[in-house]
């Protein structure tokens, strides 16, 4: 049985549904507002650096199967030339978001590359420019320190020292930088967007809204 609409029926899906199922509210709601079958992915954020100190900023974001690092910084105040491990499998990281160029936020990016990371590194244009200087300089320090320590080790019979990363690692990582403008909405992956906002800490520094 069809129900007569109390008002003229316009040529729209909702009006047609109301005309056909006007008295059956349950059916009407299901047809007009069908239930969502796709569940939203859970966003999980893990603090794996600078959670108990200022330096070594590194945060691990998981959204479904997507894995993103926010910063990948070097700890300072320790012997920064000692080999360090990236706390997540580098080859599984899909992208990096970088807040600014200070080494305690960016200094382990070349090590991330050396261990297998090949994804994009998003940061502001000014941060990209500074990283091209600072990460090369950091790589030079790593290689120089390793050479100096190995000369000492050779005399004392100690083990060979391997730098955190090389200039080649730094240069290759720099090729993966993706410059972004402030307040630009960046589609990282389907359903994951980011926006950089100016915070005034350093040229190019930003807070990141996800």
Question: What residue ranges belong to the model's regions?
Answer:
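His/Asp/Glu-rich metal-coordinating catalytic cores
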Residues: 43-97, 106, 112-210
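Short, low-complexity intrinsically disordered segments enriched in small and basic residues
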Residues: 2, 6, 26-28, 32-35
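Short, Lys/Arg-enriched N-terminal segments with co-localized hydrophobic residues
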Residues: 17, 29-42
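Intrinsic-disorder-associated, low-complexity terminal segments enriched in Asp/Asn/His/Tyr and depleted
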Residues: 3, 10-11, 15, 24
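Active-site recognition of the HExxH zinc-binding catalytic motif
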Residues: 100
């Amino acid at each position: 049985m069809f129900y007569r609409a109390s008002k003229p029926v316009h040529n729209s899906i909702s009006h047609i549904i109301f005309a056909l199922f006007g008295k059956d509210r349950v059916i009407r709601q299901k047809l007009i507002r069908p239930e969502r079958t796709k569940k939203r992915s859970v966003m999980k954020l893990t603090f794996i650096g600078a959670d108990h100190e200022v330096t070594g900023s590194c945060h691990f974001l998981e959204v479904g199967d997507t894995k993103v690092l926010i910063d990948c910084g070097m700890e300072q105040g320790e012997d920064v030339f000692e080999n360090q491990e990236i706390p997540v499998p580098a080859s599984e990281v899909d992208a990096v978001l970088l807040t600014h160029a200070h080494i305690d936020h960016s200094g382990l990016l070349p090590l991330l590359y050396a261990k297998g990371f090949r994804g994009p590194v998003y940061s502001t244009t000014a941060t990209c420019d500074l990283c091209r200087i600072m990460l090369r300089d950091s790589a030079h320090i790593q290689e120089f320190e390793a050479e100096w320590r190995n000369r000492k080790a050779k005399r004392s019979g100690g083990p060979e020292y391997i730098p955190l990363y090389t200039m080649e690692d730094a240069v290759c990582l720099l090729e993966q930088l993706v410059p972004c403008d402030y307040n630009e909405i960046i589609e990282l992956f389907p359903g994951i967007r980011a926006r950089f906002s100016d915070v005034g800490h350093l040229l190019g520094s930003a807070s990141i809204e996800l």
